């Protein structure tokens, strides 16, 4: 029986490379000269540090551009409100990975409403789709691409 998995993952190496590129560009740009603007990365979070909110916005634009060039979907980033304290501005950006239970339920609901002859099961932070025909699975992929989910999805382990 053909199956595939629906996941939401971020390539950590590409993310780190994009952050390094942004930090390098910030060091050479004229509008950031003499400031201590940089991006710090922890496990699942990016922290943008600058001297003003305008510089944070510029850093976010540069980050989005570099991520897009490296093939990382920008929708996986969830920005929080910037904190401005004196001459320091910080913004925390959460890197979302994995499909949470609510989104997995939405995916299963969308599949069931389509009345395709496939089964969907939640397996941790991914959803496994199985069906008798490969065409049905391809229709499910097309259906999920058109669905309005606020999370970038990847389709892996397509097996016959």
Curated annotation (Swiss-Prot):
The molecular function terms of the Gene Ontology recorded here are: nucleotide binding
The name of this protein is Nucleotide-binding protein Noc_2254
| InterPro entries named in the record | DUF520 (IPR007551), UPF0234-like_C (IPR035571), UPF0234_N (IPR035570), YajQ-like_sf (IPR036183)
Q: Which SUPFAM superfamilies match?
A: YajQ-like
Tell me the function of this protein.
Answer: Nucleotide-binding protein.
- In which family does this protein belong, per the annotation? Belongs to the YajQ family.
Identify the GO cellular component terms for this protein. Answer: cytosol
Ordered alphabetically, the record's keywords are: Nucleotide-binding
Q: Which domain of life is it from?
A: Bacteria
Has keyword Methyltransferase? no
